[in-house]
């Protein structure tokens, strides 16, 4: 969060899990007890508790992040604020963030892979239910349906990328390491590099002017 507060860079990725507290563990005769004894805050006065750090530029993920983090705990401390501290803002990035977001959005919208991640995320949400069928026959049918749907999503992506597809779900599970086209970590690194290039390109004219006058 300090990178954002001092305007020294761009946070790229997904929202963090929202832990902004400090715990102490004391020993008991038959176990341990954990106390939450303090909270920490950013120089802006905002806590990361329950909210985490929000990225400047979101990258799609197949995970439903609402299900993770301290905010999901029933008695987690709430997000709050304290008075802002005195600090120096470097004013380097904030003014170009709208353009960075626009350029990133255009690439994400055109990306077959990132559209696939959104499809997987939507599919996972559609599978959420508070009910569990206790019938073994129905459970087997449900398992087969899930495997069929996941295989169809995977093969659809691979077809669009001109990659080999799978004939059945088992061969999909036993596949070798995914190629670069399907490696989410490498995709994220590549997009982050693209954002860095955008920053350099957008900032190029002022930097050249500075060099000429210097």
Q: For the regions a protein language model found, what residue spans apply to each?
A:
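Conserved functional hotspot residues or short segments at active or partner-binding sites
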Residues: 48-212
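Conserved acidic, small-residue-rich alpha-beta core segments centered on
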Residues: 1-82
């Amino acid at each position: 969060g300090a990178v954002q507060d001092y305007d020294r860079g761009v946070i790229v990725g997904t929202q963090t899990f929202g832990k902004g507290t400090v715990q102490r563990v004391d020993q008991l005769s038959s176990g341990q007890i954990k106390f939450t004894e303090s909270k920490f805050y950013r120089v802006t006065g905002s806590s990361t508790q329950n909210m985490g750090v929000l990225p400047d530029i979101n990258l799609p993920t197949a995970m439903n992040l609402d299900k993770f983090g301290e905010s999901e705990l029933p008695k987690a401390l709430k997000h709050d604020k304290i008075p802002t501290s005195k600090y120096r803002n470097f004013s380097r990035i904030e003014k170009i963030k709208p353009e960075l977001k626009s350029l990133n959005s255009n690439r994400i919208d055109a990306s077959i892979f990132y559209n696939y991640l959104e499809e997987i995320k939507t599919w996972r949400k559609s599978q959420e239910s508070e009910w569990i069928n206790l019938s073994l026959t129905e459970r087997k049918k449900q398992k087969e349906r899930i495997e069929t749907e996941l295989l169809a999503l995977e093969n659809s992506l691979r077809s669009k990328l001109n990659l080999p597809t799978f004939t059945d779900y088992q061969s999909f599970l036993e596949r070798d390491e995914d190629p670069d086209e399907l490696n989410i970590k490498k995709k994220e690194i590549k997009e982050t590099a693209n954002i860095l290039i955008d920053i350099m390109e957008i900032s190029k004219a002022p930097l050249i002017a500075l060099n000429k006058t210097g």
